[in-house]
């Protein structure tokens, strides 16, 4: 799992959008999390995790506060999640997660990115079964046995635990996110998460090579340029530079 996760992080770094896109992405997610679960980060773990990630990505405080204030006031856009699946260059598998206030527009924009790069958008569920929908927590530590024990005592369904270079990474089903985070924070006072996310991790990878590489990069760029796109997950494995 760790390798797939690292591949994704490296891919994200290469295709990171401009700052304004990052701010907009977090603004929407924070607004939706606050609207759904309340504006208090201590009571709303999803909101707290988003705020912590936004700060690590250098999102200004005023952007975060504006999104929460908008949720508090009950005003603002009515975003809904949308997910699209399909096959990218080299026949790699792709999941595109969006937040949209206009599903028809979003579908049209995402479909255009697929068709412009000779890719195929599929039906719901077309490739999702080939990914694990995981909650991921990474933090400094070496005693993975103590971590596993704390999670087991809290009745958390643990998928995997990895320990490497003084860092422990915990993988659980996405539905266990809140329970796992609460268990870790209760067991290890002052714990600071380097990673605190829900991701789709591929069960297998597809090698993308030759002429498919620039097409794949163009495909990701087109998707990441769309305001409604929040995350792009894929199983592509690119040659090491």
UniProtKB/Swiss-Prot annotation:
It is found in: Cytoplasm. One of its GO terms (cellular component) is cytosol. The keyword Transcription regulation applies. It comes from the Bacteria. Keywords: Cytoplasm, DNA-binding, Transcription, Transcription regulation. The keyword S-adenosyl-L-methionine does not apply. Gene3D superfamilies: 1.10.10.200, 3.30.70.980. One of its GO terms (molecular function) is DNA binding. It holds the Pfam family Transcrip_reg. HAMAP family: Transcrip_reg_TACO1. NCBIfam families: PRK12378.1 (NF009044). Belongs to the TACO1 family. This is Probable transcriptional regulatory protein Maqu_2154. It comes from Marinobacter nauticus (strain ATCC 700491 / DSM 11845 / VT8).
């Amino acid at each position: 799992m760790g390798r797939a996760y690292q591949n994704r992080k490296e891919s994200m770094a290469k295709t990171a959008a401009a700052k304004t896109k990052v701010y907009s992405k977090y603004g929407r997610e924070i607004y939706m999390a606050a609207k759904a679960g309340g504006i208090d980060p201590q009571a709303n773990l999803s909101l707290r995790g988003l705020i912590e990630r936004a700060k690590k990505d250098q999102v200004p405080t005023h952007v975060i506060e504006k999104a929460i204030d908008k949720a508090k006031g009950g005003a603002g856009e009515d975003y809904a999640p949308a997910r699209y699946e399909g096959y990218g260059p080299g026949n790699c598998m792709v999941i595109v997660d969006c937040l949209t206030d206009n599903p028809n527009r979003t579908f049209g924009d995402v479909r255009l990115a697929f068709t412009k790069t000779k890719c195929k958008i599929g039906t719901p569920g077309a490739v999702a079964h080939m990914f694990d929908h995981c909650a991921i927590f990474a933090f400094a530590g070496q005693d993975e046995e103590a971590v596993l024990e704390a999670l087991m005592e809290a009745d958390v369904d643990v998928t995997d635990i990895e320990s490497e270079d003084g860092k422990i990474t915990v993988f659980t089903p996405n539905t266990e996110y809140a329970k796992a985070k609460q268990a870790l924070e209760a067991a290890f006072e002052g714990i600071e998460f380097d990673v605190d996310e829900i991701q789709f991790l591929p069960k297998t990878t597809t090698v993308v090579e030759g002429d498919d590489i620039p097409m794949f990069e163009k495909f990701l760029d087109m998707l990441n340029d769309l305001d409604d796109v929040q995350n792009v997950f894929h199983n592509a494995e690119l040659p090491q530079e």
